[in-house]
């Protein structure tokens, strides 16, 4: 196994990056620590959704108050509701939880040991913990949401207050607090939103440390240029450019942010595709107009904007700009939209698009590739990998699944020679199963050259002449031998000792690896041979 890559530079770094969008924070004057709860968000967008299986973006970060260095970073399956440092012990109590959307209020009481980094989930049964407060060294006051809202229209405004005592909270074991200790009558409970004051607090703490808090999140696309510049698309930014010096050259802002970057055929500009989600405005849901813009790489000037009328995904490969509509609610089979410098033409019918079945972004594509169903009225079934010819015709190459009767979801891909390497997951009625995520290399006649199985879905992949690089939503980064699929190296992504996850990666022309992280940073990694 060869050496793992080394992070030699971090672009877009800043304090509190690890926790994403902050929800609340508390300062402990005794230990001079700051605890922050936040959310990195999902690792899916309207163009692709399979990477969100087994993912949670909820985080608890514990930072040094003076230097703002992240000392601990803990994943939570539920949003963070409350934080409280123990008055004496190196222990942080965290209340988490949410309503499941139909019946139950679920969550955990987490006890984070700041000396050993052990995390204890202390409740015997899942309960949303709205508030935690230390009354003394031995007494912890909890406010818990009702178990459910069955025949209780006031459940969302109620809480059950209980005081749990332990002689030594540092010795509490997993699932040690039973339901009998939490039994209490329901009372009105206020659930304030602390996000605005938390943002102000983090900005003030950063300013006091001589730093700036920016709140960057989720780098969805990253590309390296021949001259050493780095392009990226991320939340709130349609596209940005970083100079070889490490300074940000320009940025084009957007209400949602860019999700795709595709270098234009002229070599001097890049196409950027923005996310558009429905948002409630008053009593109605509204969706902003799609935004697909071509941006000059040198100056960041928006040169043109396409108006497809519906949200679409950019399809790479070839000289034309090709869009695949994402209007999944339409009853008509969708067609590709093909643009060149002088005109727009309708492409072949490809069926309706959904983010789980049809995501198939192919890097280094010599021609456009899409996933299409054999029945355009049921496009998610019996999908084939198809190529779009120069004349706009669609040629089916081989079935997406090489196992008969097995349904597979889409994922990232790369073309290597006369073959495609692509990642995905296998459908199962009970969700993603162990070994249900894969990377496979197949010849253009459909023959399987090799496959590599894992438990977590891939978020991104790319390749050079002999290695396939795969990022997973678990935070893993794996290099596979392009010839036989064996593991060259495997590592867990970290920045400053704190784990992170990569929604995007790209092999730069200079040979190093660019990794876009879920917390808004771009890692430049050297690949030692």
What residue ranges belong to the model's regions?
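A short beta-strand motif characteristic of beta-propeller blades
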Residues: 7-17, 69-74, 118-123, 206-214, ...
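Beta-strand-rich domains and repeat architectures in extracellular enzymes and scaffolds
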Residues: 13-55, 81-83, 210-236
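Repeated scaffold domains used in trafficking and secretory/extracellular systems
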Residues: 18-26, 76-85, 125-137, 181-188, ...
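Hydrophobic beta-strand positions that form the internal "hydrophobic ladder"
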Residues: 33-34, 92, 140-142, 230-231, ...
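Residue-level signature of beta-propeller blades and closely related beta-rich strand-turn architectures
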Residues: 39-40, 97-99, 146-148, 236, ...
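Short, solvent-exposed loop/turn segments at conserved positions within beta-propeller repeat blades
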Residues: 43-57, 101-107, 150-160, 233-234, ...
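Blade-level signature of beta-propeller repeat domains, shared across WD40, Kelch, NHL, RCC1
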Residues: 143-170, 497-529
């Amino acid at each position: 196994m060869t050496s793992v890559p080394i992070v030699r530079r971090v672009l877009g770094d800043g304090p509190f990056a690890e926790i994403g969008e902050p929800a609340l924070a508390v300062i402990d004057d005794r230990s001079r620590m700051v605890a922050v709860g936040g959310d990195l968000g999902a690792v899916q967008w309207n163009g692709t959704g399979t990477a969100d299986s087994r993912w949670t973006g909820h985080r608890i970060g514990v930072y040094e108050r003076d230097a703002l260095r992240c000392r601990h970073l803990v994943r939570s399956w539920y949003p963070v509701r409350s934080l409280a440092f123990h008055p004496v012990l190196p222990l942080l109590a965290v209340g988490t939880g949410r309503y499941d959307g139909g019946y139950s209020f679920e969550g955990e009481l987490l006890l984070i040991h700041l000396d050993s980094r052990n995390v204890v989930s202390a409740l015997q049964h899942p309960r949303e913990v709205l508030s935690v407060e230390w009354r003394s060294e031995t007494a912890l006051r909890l406010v818990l949401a009702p178990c459910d809202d069955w025949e209780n229209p006031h459940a969302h405004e109620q809480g059950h207050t209980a005081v749990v005592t332990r002689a030594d909270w540092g010795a509490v074991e997993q699932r040690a607090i039973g339901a009998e200790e939490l039994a209490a009558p329901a009372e009105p409970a206020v659930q304030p939103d602390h996000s605005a004051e938390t943002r102000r607090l983090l900005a003030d703490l950063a300013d006091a440390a001589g730093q700036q808090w920016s709140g960057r999140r989720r780098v969805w696309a990253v590309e390296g240029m021949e001259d050493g510049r780095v392009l990226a698309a991320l939340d709130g930014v349609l596209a940005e450019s970083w100079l070889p010096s490490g300074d940000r050259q320009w940025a084009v802002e957007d209400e949602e942010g860019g999700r795709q970057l595709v270098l234009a055929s002229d070599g001097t500009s890049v196409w950027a595709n923005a996310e558009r989600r429905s948002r409630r405005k008053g009593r109605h849901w509204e969706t902003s107009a799609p935004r697909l813009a071509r941006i000059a790489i040198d100056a960041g000037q928006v040169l043109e904007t396409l108006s497809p009328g519906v949200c679409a995904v950019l399809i790479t490969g070839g000289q034309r700009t090709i869009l695949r509509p994402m209007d999944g609610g339409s009853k008509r089979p969708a067609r590709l939209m093909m643009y060149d410098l002088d005109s727009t033409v309708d492409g072949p019918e490809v069926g309706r698009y959904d983010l789980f079945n049809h995501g198939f972004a192919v890097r280094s594509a010599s021609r456009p590739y899409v996933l299409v169903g054999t029945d355009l009225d049921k496009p998610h079934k019996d999908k084939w990998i198809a190529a779009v010819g120069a004349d706009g015709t669609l040629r089916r190459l081989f079935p997406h699944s090489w196992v008969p009767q097995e349904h597979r979801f889409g994922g990232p891909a790369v073309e290597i020679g006369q073959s495609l390497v692509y990642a995905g997951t296998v459908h199962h009625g009970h969700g993603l199963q162990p070994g249900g995520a894969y990377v496979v290399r197949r010849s253009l006649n459909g023959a399987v050259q090799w496959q590599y199985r894992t438990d977590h879905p891939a978020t991104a992949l790319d390749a050079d002449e002999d290695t396939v690089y795969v990022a997973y939503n678990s935070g893993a980064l794996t290099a596979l031998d392009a010839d036989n699929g064996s593991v060259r190296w495997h590592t867990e992504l970290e920045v400053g000792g704190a784990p992170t996850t990569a929604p995007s990666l790209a092999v730069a022309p200079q040979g190093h690896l660019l990794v876009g992280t879920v917390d808004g940073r771009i890692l430049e990694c050297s690949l030692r041979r």
